[in-house]
Amino acid sequence: MVSTLRKLGHDVQPLGVKSDLEVIRAAVEDWKPHIAFNLLEEFDGRAVYDQNVVSYLELMRIPYTGCNPRGLMLARDKALAKQVMSYHRIPYPEFMVVPLHRMVRRPKYLPFPLIVKSISEEASLGISQASIVDDDEKLRERVAFIHDNVGTGALIERYIEGRELYVGVMGNAHLQVFPVW
């Protein structure tokens, strides 16, 4: 990415941001960038904190690439995303959320098989074959696994057999849809 931008004639200053916003503030004061090319995956070891870094860029009035903090929050919170889908009448599998440190009680509207995953982590973190459960004992075990090992609430939803496809979309008023993969 850096070499391509430089070949196109742009001045580029890569910035490693682990857990210190001061790095960003100092770079902005010293270098005065026109835009921040945001490739941040996590902050302070947590993927869910990336929205806070983007909020910091907004507070500093630095234009940046990628989603705004609200988009990042919506993309991370699977239950909130499902509420937005419901509002727009987009179908999704029935689900329930088990907050951290709570016991699971499966409602009758959620028949097996089910899939259990983190409510907020991405990139399949915590998902394996064991995530697909077909009885209440395995369901309790998997929710405990998500709580104890991933450290988030658990999303339980009806399992749908098949491949999961990703579709990239870019734009606002005029959307560009990228190839499905």
Give the location of each predicted region:
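ATP-binding N-terminal substructure of ATP-dependent carboxylate-amine bond-forming enzymes
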Residues: 1-65, 69-70, 74-76, 87, ...
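Short, hinge-like loop/turn segments at secondary-structure boundaries
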Residues: 30-33, 54-55, 81-86, 110-114, ...
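ATP-grasp fold ATP-binding core
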Residues: 38, 85-86, 110-128, 151-161
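Short, glycine-/small-residue-rich phosphate/pyrophosphate-handling segment
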Residues: 76-96
